[in-house]
A protein has these predicted regions:
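Extreme N-terminal tail/first-helix region
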Residues: 1-19
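Short beta-strand segments
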Residues: 15-50, 58, 66
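Short low-complexity stretches enriched in small and charged residues
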Residues: 1-4, 28-36, 73-78
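Short, P/G- and charge-enriched loop/turn segments at secondary-structure junctions
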Residues: 6-8, 23-24, 106-109
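Short, structured beta-strand-loop surface elements
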Residues: 51-125
């Protein structure tokens, strides 16, 4: 089953945008927001456009089990902060390649130094 979930996560990462569902803890309300997602040679990554102030990001740190969905297709994933500079550079390149031409201003924002620490690896569970 984990292989199927991982395959679906990679498939969803091909989408321009996904929705991420987060909650601070099991008793808290569920929140859903649209975000960008990128596949890299190191894994699948997401990042908070609002930096560390983003609610979904804060909730994902507090409760790293999230749901990533496109329409009716969804996968449960565990997110974990990425600190490796080599991987961060690969994620930057993936954002540029996937979004840079169509959304140059928004992509530039996603590559700001203040946003980079919000890079999270998504691992299907």
């Amino acid at each position: 089953m984990a292989k199927k979930a991982e395959d679906l996560l990679w498939k969803l990462a091909e989408s321009d945008e996904v929705e991420i569902e987060t909650r601070r803890d099991a008793k808290s309300p569920l929140h859903r927001v649209t975000i960008w997602i990128v596949p890299t040679e190191y894994g699948v990554y997401v990042r908070s456009y609002k930096g560390k102030k983003g609610r979904w990001y804060q909730e994902a740190l507090a409760n790293p089990l999230v749901t990533i969905r496109v329409g009716r297709r969804k996968v449960t994933a565990r997110v974990e902060p990425e600190h490796n500079p080599l991987v961060i550079r690969a994620v930057n390149a993936a954002y540029r390649k996937k979004y840079g031409e169509r959304w140059p201003d928004e992509t530039k924002e996603m590559l700001k130094r203040s946003i980079l620490p919000t890079t999270l690896r998504s691992i299907a569970v």
